Amino acid sequence: MYYNTLIKTQGELIMKLYIEEKVVNIPVDIAWKALKEMNVWLPKLSTNKGVDYDKDGVFFKQGRKYKVTSKEGVVMDSEIYSVDEANMEIEIHAEHKHLKSILKCRVIDLGNKTCKLMRTQGYPGWFGVIFTAFWGKRESGETAEYLDVWEEYAKTLLN
């Protein structure tokens, strides 16, 4: 399921959002563990060339800074802005010059060893709107692929 929407407040554009949800036959704790190990599978996205970070301990923690290099060579300075273990949700902020990104990922337990993977990516401000006007198709494809790669990695943790 994919949504592409604009968020407005008092008629003023705030950001363009890409929202994707996927129901998977994976226990919720495994899906959450896979998300927490995103540093392993993020480089597998076709839109990414690499993920660089200081290997000092746990990757998945609030305040963790890292760089994601796109296949086009753009380096996004990223930070795990918040981690909500109780609700199995993270928020990541990233930027490259004037381009800013807000990414939220969440796992929802549906019972019977099934869960929903959710990813929402937004690009705030007019610069984000201009960026998505040119790169919207790429971003919507990445949104879907992100959940597929996350799911595939989670399946490797089942064994």
For each predicted feature, which ranges?
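Hydrophobic ligand-binding cavity/cleft-lining segments
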Residues: 3-56
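Short, surface-exposed coil-to-beta transition loops
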Residues: 17-19, 73-78, 99-104
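Hydrophobic small-molecule pocket/channel-lining residues, especially in calycin-type beta-barrels
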Residues: 24, 40, 81, 91, ...
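A short, structured loop/turn motif at beta-sheet edges
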Residues: 25-29, 81-88, 106-116
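Beta-strand elements of well-folded, non-transmembrane domains
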Residues: 26, 72-74, 123-125
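Eukaryotic helix-grip
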Residues: 40, 44, 83-88, 122
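Glycine-rich portal/gate segments that line the openings of hydrophobic small-molecule binding cavities
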Residues: 52-96, 149-157
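Beta-strand/loop substructures that line and gate deep hydrophobic ligand-binding cavities in soluble
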Residues: 95-145
